[in-house]
C-alpha cells in the first residue's frame, strides 16, 4: 500500500503539491506576505467590503449585544433574530418568498442538492461546476449527468434521452464559473427547465453583489430572476463576510429546513457574521454599492485589455475573474513564484481544480484596485510571461 509520504512525494514531483500562505493583516488590495507588502490579485473580496467600516461596526455592535457564539444548531436553540433578519433581507434582495443561511458555500451546495434530489431523480450539471455541486450530487444518490460546459444542445439531448418516471429533474449550474470567469447561459437554461418540467438551481457565489444593475447577480443580468427556482450564493466573496444562503419559495426553504443535513447538524452562524452580512447587503443595495460595481467593471476592462494587448489568452472571461492561460503545472507555479518576487500575489491553478493542460493564473480584481495597481500587475505578468515563453 502506498504511504502518505509516497503520495506527497508524487504530488511534489508533478507540481501538484499544495500548501498555505500566511497573509498578514486585512483583506484589502495590498497584503503582507513574508514580512513585505504585495499587491493582492487573488482574493474574492471583489468590492473590498471585508475591511469596510460599516461591516466592522455592525459586527462589533452584534458581539456587544449578543455575544460571540450562537450556542446551538438552528433547530435547537441557535436561531436568533439576526438570522431571521438576514434571511428576510436576502429573500427581498433575490426576489423570493424565503431564504435560509448556511455555514459555507460548500455546506450550502452539498446540503441543498442532496436534500432536493435522491434516488429516482436526475441531476444535470455543467462539467465546470464547482466541486461542492459535484459532491452534493454524489451524496444525493440521484443519477448524475454532466453535460459539456455551456453546451445547451447536448443538455437538451440529455434531457430528452433521460427518463424520469416519477422523480425530479434538477438542472444546476454556476452563474459565474469560478475558474474561467465566464457566465452560464441562463436564459437558455430557463427555457429548457420549463420545457422539461425541471428545477433550476444557480450557484451565484461569484455573481452576487457584482453583476446586474442592482448587484443581484447573474440571473438579474440575464433578466431571469423570477425564473430560477433556487438561488444559491455566498456571503464571503463580494459581500465581504462569511457563510452562504439559499433563496427560494417558502415550500422549498421549509423542505431544506427539514431535509438539508448540512443545515440541520451544524451550529448556526455567529452574531458578528450575521450582522456584518446584513450590513453588506444594505451597502450593496445602495448608491455606494453601485459605485463600487462600476469601479470593478472599469478595472476588469482595463486589466483584460492590457493582458490581451500583449498576447495573453484570458480564456473567454466575462467577469472580474480573469484567468491567464499558461498550460503546464510546473510552469504555472513558476510563473506564480516569480510574480510574488515582483510583489504581485497571484495563485497558480492546477489539477484537480482544472483539467490537465489548462493550468492558469487566476487573477481576481477588486473595486479598490487603482490604475497604478493594475498597471503594476500587467507589467509584471508581461515580463514574466515573456521570460517563460508564455507569450
Curated annotation (Swiss-Prot):
<feature type="binding site">
    <location>
        <begin position="105"/>
        <end position="106"/>
    </location>
    <ligand>
        <name>pyridoxal 5'-phosphate</name>
    </ligand>
</feature>
<protein>
    <recommendedName>
        <fullName>8-amino-7-oxononanoate synthase</fullName>
        <ecNumber>2.3.1.47</ecNumber>
    </recommendedName>
</protein>
<feature type="binding site">
    <location>
        <position position="206"/>
    </location>
    <ligand>
        <name>pyridoxal 5'-phosphate</name>
    </ligand>
</feature>
<keyword id="KW-0808">Transferase</keyword>
<dbReference type="Pfam" id="PF00155">
    <property type="entry name" value="Aminotran_1_2"/>
</dbReference>
<dbReference type="InterPro" id="IPR050087">
    <property type="entry name" value="AON_synthase_class-II"/>
</dbReference>
<keyword id="KW-0663">Pyridoxal phosphate</keyword>
<dbReference type="InterPro" id="IPR015421">
    <property type="entry name" value="PyrdxlP-dep_Trfase_major"/>
</dbReference>
<dbReference type="InterPro" id="IPR004723">
    <property type="entry name" value="AONS_Archaea/Proteobacteria"/>
</dbReference>
<comment type="pathway">
    <text>Cofactor biosynthesis; biotin biosynthesis.</text>
</comment>
<feature type="binding site">
    <location>
        <position position="178"/>
    </location>
    <ligand>
        <name>pyridoxal 5'-phosphate</name>
    </ligand>
</feature>
<feature type="binding site">
    <location>
        <position position="353"/>
    </location>
    <ligand>
        <name>substrate</name>
    </ligand>
</feature>
<dbReference type="InterPro" id="IPR022834">
    <property type="entry name" value="AONS_Proteobacteria"/>
</dbReference>
<feature type="modified residue" description="N6-(pyridoxal phosphate)lysine">
    <location>
        <position position="237"/>
    </location>
</feature>
<comment type="similarity">
    <text>Belongs to the class-II pyridoxal-phosphate-dependent aminotransferase family. BioF subfamily.</text>
</comment>
<dbReference type="InterPro" id="IPR015424">
    <property type="entry name" value="PyrdxlP-dep_Trfase"/>
</dbReference>
<dbReference type="InterPro" id="IPR004839">
    <property type="entry name" value="Aminotransferase_I/II_large"/>
</dbReference>
<comment type="subunit">
    <text>Homodimer.</text>
</comment>
<feature type="binding site">
    <location>
        <position position="234"/>
    </location>
    <ligand>
        <name>pyridoxal 5'-phosphate</name>
    </ligand>
</feature>
<feature type="binding site">
    <location>
        <position position="18"/>
    </location>
    <ligand>
        <name>substrate</name>
    </ligand>
</feature>
<dbReference type="GO" id="GO:0009102">
    <property type="term" value="P:biotin biosynthetic process"/>
</dbReference>
<dbReference type="GO" id="GO:0030170">
    <property type="term" value="F:pyridoxal phosphate binding"/>
</dbReference>
<dbReference type="InterPro" id="IPR001917">
    <property type="entry name" value="Aminotrans_II_pyridoxalP_BS"/>
</dbReference>
<feature type="binding site">
    <location>
        <position position="130"/>
    </location>
    <ligand>
        <name>substrate</name>
    </ligand>
</feature>
<dbReference type="GO" id="GO:0008710">
    <property type="term" value="F:8-amino-7-oxononanoate synthase activity"/>
</dbReference>
<dbReference type="InterPro" id="IPR015422">
    <property type="entry name" value="PyrdxlP-dep_Trfase_small"/>
</dbReference>
<comment type="function">
    <text>Catalyzes the decarboxylative condensation of pimeloyl-[acyl-carrier protein] and L-alanine to produce 8-amino-7-oxononanoate (AON), [acyl-carrier protein], and carbon dioxide.</text>
</comment>
<keyword id="KW-0093">Biotin biosynthesis</keyword>
